[in-house]
């Protein structure tokens, strides 16, 4: 492996980028991974803690779900204009500022966690999360040649997975052992470190922008030079058509993630308090670890096949299975070791599918959209992901309040089943893609 340095390096031109033989030689990738690790570490740290704290302080399941939903709503709205923001101020400023917004406002919860403050801080943190998620997903395509994108996406998945593997149990352990002050302080530390690392991410070089402008000019001239070829060429499909299937897949699996992250902890507390802390902490850690494995598998498989999407259906199937098992487990309400084993199994199976679908959907969007729409592809992936998480948390919270926790998991499984049917249909009858800019798919390098 090439030596890794955090020293600031200029971005590479297109020609220089194509000479890279390893993702670890890409300037700025390691700094990006550190920033991503801290962003997702801080987010994951508080993800199960805030809903659980709301319920422990007398709030309803609906309010707990609403806090997640408002966070994700702000996230999605921010993601819509993040590509523009990146063009204006660059990746380093976006990543650094977003990291601060994601972590530091949570310190206000030490003073006040009333509903207005709870939801107001959720909006601020959601804005930070929205910007950082779009930027980091786009960077894995910007910093490496397209043939190595499977490896860079696997590296990104590893950073996210390790962050979740550590932070899921850490947040709940800190809450139970030391109280809220420790949890929110650690989230603030994550924010500061991640923001500092972001300043070592290179700006896109002028040479790179000139290369892209030249390619666009050449393509325009070529189309103008031969009207017959233009007439015979396929009309590019609308962006929403190209993005619909991967967007539905990630949105559906994210709804299932909302069920696990928001309602697993209170559900097991209602069944057996003696093992609730273990399941709440380690169960989500198992989910994060298997998610990391799924993203690595999907990235490597795409590198070998040269095309993304082959494992999307399998991933959704695993996610559906995990949700159904979790619902059955909560309905049967076993205690002790059976409850622990069942929760770990359900979380692990879901996590594997979650990771597979995450990676497949992102690479499918990068493949289907033109090169100049890399940040748009990243924004669409993140918007559908976080819409699924946010809307899922709200709707499943209503279901949990009106019926029972298991209903939330089963409803999420039904949504996943619909997405699976669409993905299968897409693989069978949707092989031919109409795209505006031809480009090679990721291939083994």
Model-derived segments and spans:
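Juxtamembrane intracellular "pre-TM" segments in multi-pass secondary transporters
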Residues: 7-26, 205-246, 442-445
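Helix-loop boundary and gating motifs at the non-cytosolic
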Residues: 23-65, 257-268
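Residue-level signature of mid-helix packing/kink "hotspots" within the transmembrane helices
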Residues: 72-80, 164-165, 288-296, 390
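Helix-to-loop junctions at the C-terminal end of transmembrane segments
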Residues: 78-90, 294-307
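Cytoplasmic membrane-interface "Motif A"-like loop-to-helix N-cap segments
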Residues: 88-98, 303-317
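Cytoplasmic helix-loop-helix junction between adjacent transmembrane helices
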Residues: 123-160
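Symmetry-related core transmembrane helices of the 12-TM Major Facilitator Superfamily/SLC fold
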Residues: 184-199, 409-425
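C-terminal transmembrane helical hairpin of 12-TM major facilitator-type secondary transporters
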Residues: 309-358
């Amino acid at each position: 492996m090439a030596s890794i340095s955090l020293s600031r390096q200029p971005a590479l031109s297109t020609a220089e980028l194509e000479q890279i033989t390893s993702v670890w030689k890409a300037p700025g990738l390691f700094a990006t991974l550190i920033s991503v690790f801290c962003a997702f570490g801080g987010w994951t740290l508080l993800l199960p803690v805030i809903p659980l704290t709301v319920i422990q302080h007398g709030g309803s399941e609906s309010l707990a779900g609403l806090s997640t939903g408002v966070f994700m709503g702000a996230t999605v709205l921010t993601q819509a204009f993040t590509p523009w923001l990146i063009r204006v101020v660059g990746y380093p400023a976006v990543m650094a500022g977003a990291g601060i917004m994601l972590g530091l406002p949570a310190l206000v919860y030490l003073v006040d966690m009333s509903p207005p403050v709870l939801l107001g801080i959720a909006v601020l943190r959601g804005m930070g999360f929205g910007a950082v998620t779009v930027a980091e997903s786009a960077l894995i395509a910007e910093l490496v040649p397209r043939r190595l994108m499977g490896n860079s996406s696997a590296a990104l998945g590893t950073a996210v997975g390790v962050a979740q593997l550590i932070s899921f149990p850490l947040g709940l352990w800190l809450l139970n052992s030391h109280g809220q002050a420790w949890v929110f302080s650690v989230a603030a530390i994550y924010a500061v470190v991640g923001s500092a690392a972001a300043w070592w991410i290179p700006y896109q070089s002028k040479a790179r922008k000139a290369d892209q402008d030249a390619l666009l000019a050449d393509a325009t001239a070529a189309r103008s030079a031969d009207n017959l070829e233009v007439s015979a060429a396929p009309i590019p499909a609308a962006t929403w058509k190209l993005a619909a299937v991967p967007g539905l897949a990630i949105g559906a699996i994210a709804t299932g993630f909302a069920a696990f992250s928001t309602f697993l902890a209170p559900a097991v507390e209602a069944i057996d308090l003696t093992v609730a802390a273990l399941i709440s902490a380690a169960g989500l850690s198992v989910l994060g670890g298997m998610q990391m494995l799924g993203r690595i598998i999907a990235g490597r498989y795409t590198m070998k096949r040269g095309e993304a999407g082959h494992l999307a259906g399998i991933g959704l199937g695993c996610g559906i299975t995990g949700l159904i098992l979790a619902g059955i487990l909560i309905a049967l309400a076993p205690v002790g070791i059976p409850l622990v084993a069942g929760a770990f199994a359900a979380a692990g199976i879901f996590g594997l599918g979650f990771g597979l679908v995450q990676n497949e959907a992102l690479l499918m969007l990068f493949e289907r959209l033109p090169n100049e729409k890399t940040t748009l592809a990243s924004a669409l992936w993140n918007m559908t992901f976080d819409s699924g998480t946010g809307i899922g948390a709200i709707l499943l919270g209503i279901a949990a309040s009106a019926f029972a926790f298991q209903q939330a998991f089963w409803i999420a499984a039904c949504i996943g089943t619909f997405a699976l049917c669409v993905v299968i249909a897409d693989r069978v009858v949707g092989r031919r893609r109409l795209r505006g800019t031809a480009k090679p798919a990721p291939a083994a390098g």
